[in-house]
């Protein structure tokens, strides 16, 4: 079983934890790039959400709203990439992650790929599930 703590320990290039350390034991079932609403139509409990903050379609108000909505869906973690890294993450977003105990990660805008990060998380989940199935005891015939 993969947890957000494991994702943090993967030391993915260009991704770090900002807040929500209390939720690092949330179980990660898959990764998903947040793009369209309603999120409930596309996401499942345990999904690790990735989101681009471009300030044209998605700004800090949308991040806050998404955090509440995604937390209700029982996602595992939330990673944001801020266009051109022109702004620091506002304190109210950090505080909200702490309040929800929702692990909030930041992904570097330059030279960090959502596709690579999503694939790395997905591959890690698949490997963990495969390993679990390989090490489960098998029924012995008597």
At which residue positions do the language-model features occur?
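Alpha-helical/coil-rich non-catalytic "connector" segments in signaling and regulatory proteins
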Residues: 1-136, 141
């Amino acid at each position: 079983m993969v947890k957000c703590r494991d994702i943090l320990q993967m030391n993915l290039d260009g991704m770090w934890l900002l807040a929500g350390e209390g939720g690092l034991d949330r179980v990660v079932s898959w990764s998903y790039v947040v793009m369209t609403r309603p999120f409930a139509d596309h996401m499942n409990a345990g999904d690790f959400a990735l989101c681009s903050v471009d300030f044209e379609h998605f700004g800090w108000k949308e991040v806050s709203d998404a955090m509440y909505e995604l937390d209700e869906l029982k996602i595992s973690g939330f990673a944001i990439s801020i266009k051109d890294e022109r702004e620091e993450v506002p304190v109210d977003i950090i505080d909200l992650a702490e309040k929800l105990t929702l692990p909030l990660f930041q992904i570097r805008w330059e030279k960090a790929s959502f596709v690579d990060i999503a694939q790395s998380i997905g591959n890690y989940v698949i490997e963990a599930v495969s390993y679990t199935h390989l090490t489960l005891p098998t029924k012995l015939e008597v």
